[in-house]
């Protein structure tokens, strides 16, 4: 391992031992909150500490075995043991590097999916409906709950825009690579000549930010409009101003919600989505400014950002970020998204590991 990694591990080892002494000898000195904080820090360091101690042990063992290589009687056995020990050392180093990969604090969270029809008119809206169904089926496979926050239906079907909330542990971590441009190549339902058209949609994945960690939104920065709902809602539709549109003036982020009959509930939902949008915008700007990865797997959600192409006539899906092509489009649309998500996650991990190396 690189000297810089070993030095970091030595520092983490020192901190772990320090925490162990603090928590065992000074239990009564800490209040409940401080004790919980230190215990959590110790628990987070445990796996790295354990693997580093194993690495130090195997390193010492290798030195002892190497001394036996010059012994004529034991050299053959020593060579065999050395190969086993070196293999074990390599395995431990791989585990350590995996543990050193920074964890996105929002990977375990629920998330919002915003799907917008881009180029292609009615066909783009229809395709956004197909993507919506795909994500809903994938969520069903994962036993996640899906709520529709807001939607604007297309004239010929599908959606001009739809926002879903996917509720479940790990939803954001698995879906975050869906952000970006999604292009479809097929013969539209409205095409009489049988010609293949190319249309596009954009997808943005935004983590649900817990209330305790949400960005404080100043009332003076918000423009709140109310209007009559045009969606589901029974007798309340078009009779009360229950729908809410909130604009965050400093960033230009706009969110609408008309899913609930109550204006208060719509406002609460809209603020939740707005907080996620602002966080995602700030996070994207931060990543762009301080990019640690040589190759970005996360799309910007803009029209020019073509992450994936869905070709219906060939039953083909191509993810352009990792040059992956599979001829199982029918399965992907039925919710088997892990066929694409798993390779993306593996590539993401490999990219982060290369930085550590």
Curated annotation (Swiss-Prot):
Entry GO terms, CC: cytoplasm
GO terms of molecular function: translation release factor activity, codon specific
Record's keyword terms, sorted: Cytoplasm, Methylation, Protein biosynthesis
Positions where N5-methylglutamine occurs in the chain: 235
One family name in Pfam for this protein: PCRF
InterPro entries in UniProt: PCRF (IPR005139), Pep_chain_release_fac_I (IPR000352), Pep_chain_release_fac_I_sf (IPR045853), Prokaryotic/Mito_RF (IPR050057), RF-1 (IPR004373)
Keyword Cytoplasm: yes
PANTHER family, sorted: LD18447P
Protein name: Peptide chain release factor 1
Organism: Buchnera aphidicola subsp. Cinara cedri (strain Cc)
Gene transcribed to yield this protein: prfA
